[in-house]
Amino acid sequence: MTLEKFVSELQDESQPLKHAGLLQLSSLAGEDLYEFKNAWYSLPEPRKGQIMSKLVELNEDHAEMDFTAMYRALLNDENDDVREQAAKGLWECDDRVVIRPLIGLLKKDPSARVRAAAATSLAKFTDLFQQGKILSRDGDKIRDALLEVIGEEEE
């Protein structure tokens, strides 16, 4: 099944999410990622949450699947559930490019669930920092953001 056909099937909420179709979303890049992002905004809101939950679940069960580009692209989605799942999906990512957006979610997202998911995904980087595997400035940014959030009364 082509990506275009699969995206069209995603529109139909009466259809179950197909495992094989979702696997096509692994390692999306370039034009395919661009097309998927454009189609994403026309999907029904409940369907978006279903898709993201399923992708995170697939990622946990199949380590070889890489939905990082999808997660990164959807960190700023309007839907709290989508942002939460996108942040959760990055828990295994060790690419420093996700540090800044995760810190942004941690510090400014209106949803406590999204902020918690961002903090959880940043935890991997704190481990890498302690092991000397990421830049000091990145580790310092993460530490400062976490300490700032911990110091806030409502958190």
Label each PLM-derived region with a short phrase.
Residues M1-A63:
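N-terminal alpha-helical scaffold/docking segments in eukaryotic complex subunits
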Residues A73, D77-D81, Q85, E92:
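Long, hydrophobic/aromatic-enriched structural stretches that serve as scaffold segments
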Residues V56, W91, A123-D127:
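Structural signature of alpha-helical solenoid repeat scaffolds
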Residues A39, L43, L90, P110:
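Conserved aromatic-histidine-acidic binding/catalytic patches
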Residues Q15-P16, E45-G49, D80-D81, R96, ...:
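Alpha-helix N-cap/helix-start positions at coil->helix boundaries
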Residues M1-K5, L28-W40, D61-N76, D95-K107, ...:
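Amphipathic alpha-helical scaffolding segments comprising HEAT/armadillo-like alpha-solenoid repeats
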Residues P16-H19, G49, S53, E84-Q85, ...:
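Alpha-solenoid HEAT/ARM repeat scaffold
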Residues G89, A123, E152-E155:
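Charged/polar, low-hydrophobicity segments characteristic of intrinsically disordered regions
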